[in-house]
Amino acid sequence: MVRQSVLADCLNNIVNAERRGRRQVLIRPSSKVIVKFLTVMQKHGYIDEFTEIDDHRSGKIVIQLNGRINKCGVISPRFNVKLKDIEKWVNQLLPSRQVGVIVLTTSRGIMSHNEARAKDAGGKILGFFY
């Protein structure tokens, strides 16, 4: 299997586990970007909790699922998004304004599109989930 992106593989594993009705999923390898992305998902209530396991290699993450994820994905290439253009991407990627989150990486860290609006920060789109 050819690994395209560590984050893309992680989100794909999460969606597949949700569709199968699993309560937890094991992700490997681990990375800082995946951990920050999962933190945003946890903050918005789409996953219950996750724990990092250090195996002295690339690391593992065990995620406890709660059944709220319908779809999540990575946007590749990571397009630059100005503050005024965030609304356009919300309309393209999410089913509704009230449902779902777009995750951005900004100079102030990885955050949701609502946080980026509040902090007046643009950045690059990492992915989305709803």
UniProtKB/Swiss-Prot annotation:
One of its GO terms (molecular function) is structural constituent of ribosome. The keyword Flavoprotein does not apply. SUPFAM superfamilies: Ribosomal protein S8. The keyword Cell wall biogenesis/degradation does not apply. PROSITE patterns: RIBOSOMAL_S8. It is found in: Cytoplasm; Nucleus. GO terms for cellular component: cytoplasmic stress granule; cytosol; cytosolic small ribosomal subunit; nucleus. It holds the Pfam family Ribosomal_S8. Component of the small ribosomal subunit (SSU). Mature yeast ribosomes consist of a small (40S) and a large (60S) subunit. The 40S small subunit contains 1 molecule of ribosomal RNA (18S rRNA) and at least 33 different proteins. The large 60S subunit contains 3 rRNA molecules (25S, 5.8S and 5S rRNA) and at least 46 different proteins. This is Small ribosomal subunit protein uS8A.
